[in-house]
Amino acid sequence: MKNILVTGSVGQIGSELTLELRKRYGSSNVVAGINRTLPTGDLADTGPYLKVDTTNIEELAFAVRKYRIDTIYHLAAVLSAIGEKNPGLAWNIGVNGLYNVLEVARENNCAVFFPSSIGAFGPTTPLDDTPQDTIQRPTSMYGVTKVTGEMLCDYYYMRFGVDTRGVRYPGIISNVTLPGGGTTDYAVEIYYEAVKNGKFTCPLAKGTFLDMMYMPDAIDAAINLMEADPSDLKHRNAFNISAMSFDPEIIAAEIRKHIPGFVMDYDVDPVKQKIADTWPNRMDDTAAREEWGWDPKYNLESMTADMLKVISEKHNKGLI
């Protein structure tokens, strides 16, 4: 049985990934690594947790040794828009934190999952059907940390044999955890505002197409990649994965199929728009499909129906 540590376990992806890992591998075998925010609810009640500041290598090594960790899902990160406001913090957590994770993994024979992002691409990257292997050169600090992370993971595999694996996530949409400063967060906020107020002001411009994915598929991607036969993996790290691509008008139109009176206007955030304009419209995820069987379950229609159902239930119960 695996012994797993999840860093960034109270974040958008980490909180749901930790619970799913506990279901699959046993609650006591999955440790939630926390830093400034204490876990609540099921995350706190279903398994162990302890403070793990990934920028503190001694603290990280202690957690790995204490729980005899053999697999680290490294989710601790600073999101894109926040990273532009505090680039030093983004670098420290995004790069120095990952370096510590890889060093501890090397010393303790751990496998490492590292999530990269569509943010790893830049304005010179082909925006349509973005290839698996292509020029990147991002212009945001978030993107710089992700490209650096991809290269570090490749280096530690080639140089030291550390079993590093990772994906490039698109925007992630969740009905559980509220967003926290990402460029694609509007695609979560729009559902909540549609249910609560019947209207939404979008911070990205009409025609801004971005790759997106529903959280259940994002979680499956991480776990399935880590379970894949290593002999099948030609790339190992930074796999493009995609589930759907849309702009604000398309998602609004889908919501109107369920809430006919929904209205949307625009107040474009220049920081988020500048970042979004450099990201792919849609990535080519052929490598992930061929090498480890990537196959998302949700498209825009099925995701929208599920999002609105769950959020409406929360709203009716007074939870949001």
Regions found by a protein language model. Name each.
Residues G122, R137-M141, R165-D185:
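Flexible, glycine-rich beta-alpha linker
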Residues H74, Y99-M141:
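Conserved Rossmann-fold NAD(P)-dependent oxidoreductase catalytic core, especially the SDR/UDP-sugar
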Residues S117, M151-V176:
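Conserved beta-loop-beta element that borders a ligand/cofactor-binding pocket
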Residues V147, F160, I173-V188, M215-P216, ...:
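Glycine/proline-rich active-site loop of Rossmann-fold NAD(P)-dependent oxidoreductases
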Residues I135, Y169-P179, E189-M213, D217:
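A conserved pocket-lining segment of Rossmann-fold NAD(P)-dependent short-chain dehydrogenase/reductase
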Residues P203-A205, D211-I320:
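C-terminal substrate-binding subdomain of Rossmann-fold SDR/epimerase-dehydratase oxidoreductases
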Residues T54-I93:
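NAD(P)H-binding glycine-rich loop region in Rossmannoid oxidoreductase-like domains
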Residues N3-R24:
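N-terminal Rossmann NAD(P)H-binding glycine-rich loop of SDR-like oxidoreductase domains
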